[in-house]
Swiss-Prot record:
Compartment(s) where it occurs, according to its Swiss-Prot or TrEMBL record: Cytoplasm
Pfam family name, one: MnmE_helical
Names of the cofactor(s): K(+)
GO cellular component, one term: cytosol
Cofactor note: Binds 1 potassium ion per subunit.
Keywords from the UniProt entry: Cytoplasm, GTP-binding, Hydrolase, Magnesium, Metal-binding, Nucleotide-binding, Potassium, tRNA processing
Binding site for K(+): N230, T249, L251, T254
Similarity comment text for this entry: Belongs to the TRAFAC class TrmE-Era-EngA-EngB-Septin-like GTPase superfamily. TrmE GTPase family.
Binding residues for (6S)-5-formyl-5,6,7,8-tetrahydrofolate: R23, E85, R124, K457
Organism, scientific name: Nitratidesulfovibrio vulgaris (strain DP4)
Name this polypeptide is given: tRNA modification GTPase MnmE
Gene name linked to the record: mnmE
């Protein structure tokens, strides 16, 4: 991919809207804008930097739209390059026509994430900040936004950089000891060297653990409604959503495909999935639905095992509980309004449970509280603390690699392995930390990261 030409893309969501923005970045961004823009004021004397100008975008003799346009010279822009923006009406046809005109006058269509990639390549941000751009856009809750903002502010990159600086100091000590063995140059004593390695390793481990602690706040948790047919899973989904989303009938097997909807539980975003009832069936379509249900149960952060309170837990439900594990299951005894004074059923020892009547709404508020607590317990998450840093999966994997290498290095030091071989280990740990911030990340990895971005960002 070329990174020194001029690119253009629609920077706002597609669809109908009041305003849409075309972003142009690169050395010819001002020339492209000049070729298309016709000012509405006779006093227009050219584009003053960082100033909106009113006019018309024309393609040849054809006026395309009434717009506001701005030019922002680099390097103090998002990409670090010269950037121009055209603010036009937000219809998809208007935006497409203006973008095509930009391409005809010297720009090319931007690839996914190419604006942010250029910001990274031009030193405007490190890789943790670049990834945080996509995380902020996709954040499912206010807490997810706050965690992404901390990375956008560079806090994760700064913490990793501080740890790497401590390793660099150790590398210098080893280099001196290896390069000047005949000189009695003071090197860290093994005990002090080990103590510093362990201190850095502990810092790396603590950072990596932030992924597990915050994953459900960053990405949202998958909560799956599962159980036998006619247990009331779809009624429960509708009750939780506060609207009719799933079809509810008295016929067994009404739900054949899974339905997934987002739900915010006091700041904790979840993806709530209603699945086909678990039973043996000769219907091919329903069989596929049951197979998908089992797959979703295997992937779920939390399984809501919905059972008919008048029947109690049956064999298939107990098997699902055993298979999923009690730590990932919240047993929901539904239809308690039909018990008619009978004793409320209970779950096996060690299992969380709650009683509801989805049809009337009784107990749904308690269920919401129970789901939130169960998700946090099942994922090992907690309420995010002030200053919490939240690495993503890729960053956590690189941190884990660094911690493993440092552990091996400590073993080498204890075994009196020669300093030059210890230096190789130390180089590997530094490289793993550099992967976190993108200082040594292979091009193929960068391609994969930025391919997940939207076009225009």
């Amino acid at each position: 991919m070329q990174h020194d030409d001029t690119i253009a893309a629609i920077a706002t969501p597609l669809g109908q809207g009041g305003i849409g923005i075309i972003r142009i970045s690169g050395p010819a961004s001002l020339e492209v804008l000049r070729a298309l823009f016709r000012p509405s004021s006779s006093r227009f004397g050219g584009f003053r930097p960082w100033t909106l100008h009113h006019g018309t975008i024309t393609d040849g003799c054809d006026p395309l739209d009434d717009v506001l346009a701005v030019h922002m010279p680099g390097p103090r822009t998002f990409t670090g390059e010269d950037v121009s923006e055209i603010h036009c009406h937000g219809g998809s046809g208007v935006l497409a026509a203006v973008l095509e005109a930009c391409v005809r006058h010297g720009a090319r269509y931007a690839e996914r994430g190419e604006f942010t990639r250029r910001a990274f390549l031009n030193g405007r941000m490190d890789l943790t900040q670049a990834e945080a751009v996509a995380e902020m856009i996709a954040a499912p809750s206010r807490e997810g936004m706050r965690l992404a903002q901390a990375k956008l502010d560079g806090l994760l990159g700064q913490r990793v950089g501080a740890l790497r600086a401590r390793l660099d100091a150790l590398r210098m000590q080893l280099c001196v000891a290896v390069d000047f063995p005949e000189e009695e140059v003071e090197c860290l004593a093994p005990e002090a060297f080990l103590a510093e390695i362990e201190a850095v390793r502990q810092g790396v481990v603590e950072l990596s653990a932030g992924y597990a602690r915050t994953r459900c706040w960053q990405d949202g948790a998958l909560v799956v409604l599962a159980g036998q047919v006619n247990a009331g899973k779809s009624s429960l989904m509708n009750a939780l959503l506060g609207r009719r989303r799933a079809i509810v009938t008295d016929l067994p097997g009404t739900t054949r495909d899974f339905i997934e909807e987002p739900l915010n539980l006091s700041g904790l975003a979840i993806r709530l999935a209603d699945t086909a009832g678990l039973r043996e069936t000769g219907d091919i379509v329903e069989q596929e639905g049951v197979r998908m249900s089992r797959d979703l149960v295997a992937q779920a952060d939390l399984v809501l095992l919905v059972t008919d309170a008048t029947q109690g837990l049956q064999g298939p439900e107990l098997e699902l509980l055993r298979h999923a594990g009690p730590e990932r299951v919240l047993v929901v005894f539904n239809k308690t309004d039909l018990l008619e004074g009978r004793i409320l059923p209970s779950a096996p020892e060690g299992c969380r449970s709650v009683h509801v009547a989805a049809a009337s709404g009784d107990g749904v508020e308690s269920l919401v509280t129970a789901i939130r607590a169960a998700v946090l317990a099942a994922t090992g998450a907690g309420e995010p603390e002030a200053g919490e840093l939240a690495p993503n999966m890729r960053q956590a994997a690189a941190l884990d690699k660094a911690a493993t290498i440092l552990d091996e290095l400590a073993g080498d030091i204890r075994a009196h392995v020669p300093y030059d071989l210890c230096g190789v280990r130390l180089d590997g740990a530094c490289a793993a930390l550099m992967d976190v911030t993108g200082q040594s990340t292979p091009e193929a990895i960068l391609d994969a990261i930025f391919a997940s971005f939207c076009i225009g960002k």
